[in-house]
Amino acid sequence: MIAVTTPEILPLLHPLIGQLATAILSHWENYLDLSPFELPEGLGYVEGRLEGEKLIIENRCYQTPQFRKMHLELAKLGNGLDILHCVMFPRPEYPLPMFGCDIVSGKAGISAAIVDLSPTSGDKTLPSAYNQALAALPGADFAQARDLPPWGHIFSQYCLFIRPETAAEERQFLQRVTDFLTIHCKCARESQPLSGEEARIYLQGQRDYCSQQQKNDKTRRVLEKAFGWEWAERYMTGVLFDLPD
């Protein structure tokens, strides 16, 4: 088991992003048996320029017996844009959903915050243990819900996509993310591997999830402007949403 390391750019980011990154890394370290995950060469820490402003991307990646990759990305563009992106990719033989969380913060505050446990089963439903635990969580009340993208069918009924308007809503979102993480890590530790056709069904579910996420045009456009098309394609398909074998 290894210890997580604190990202260098963490103090430069929006406070909620810092709190979420710390909570994510803490859950991984406390609940799971971590080992290193090697990213493609040169993609762990990246600097570039976009429209005259400095762009920094810093990644943390680990793996466990249940997860083939657990990825936390933090990014900062000048003084106007902070981003957190996190996905936990199960090993295909484990019948687990995809944990995903994203936050975008601009000069006017946080414009988007999303968290979900997205199903990978053949019928696109969550395991019963997840449904029971998620249904038991306190209700979440936010003033401004966001619309899901056209490919949003990959998300579960528990997906939370909002624009927090107050510090209280930011704290409530942070609590919801930590609740999702706790449920996910506990269920993962108790999960038993599948074999044969069942495992192939979950493998296809994860491929569908990654394929749909690769359609995120906003992310791709930013990367293309800063680093070029070839680099953006390599990053989108090799780091953000690589397809499992």
From Swiss-Prot:
One of its GO terms (biological process) is phytochromobilin biosynthetic process. Keywords: Oxidoreductase. Signal peptide: none annotated. The keyword Chaperone does not apply. It comes from the Bacteria. The keyword Transmembrane helix does not apply. It holds the Pfam family Fe_bilin_red. It is an enzyme of class 1 (oxidoreductase). GO terms for molecular function: cobalt ion binding; phycocyanobilin:ferredoxin oxidoreductase activity. Its EC number is 1.3.7.5. It catalyses: (2R,3Z)-phycocyanobilin + 4 oxidized [2Fe-2S]-[ferredoxin] = biliverdin IXalpha + 4 reduced [2Fe-2S]-[ferredoxin] + 4 H(+). NCBIfam families: PRK02816.1. Catalyzes the four-electron reduction of biliverdin IX-alpha (2-electron reduction at both the A and D rings); the reaction proceeds via an isolatable 2-electron intermediate, 181,182-dihydrobiliverdin. Belongs to the HY2 family. This is Phycocyanobilin:ferredoxin oxidoreductase.
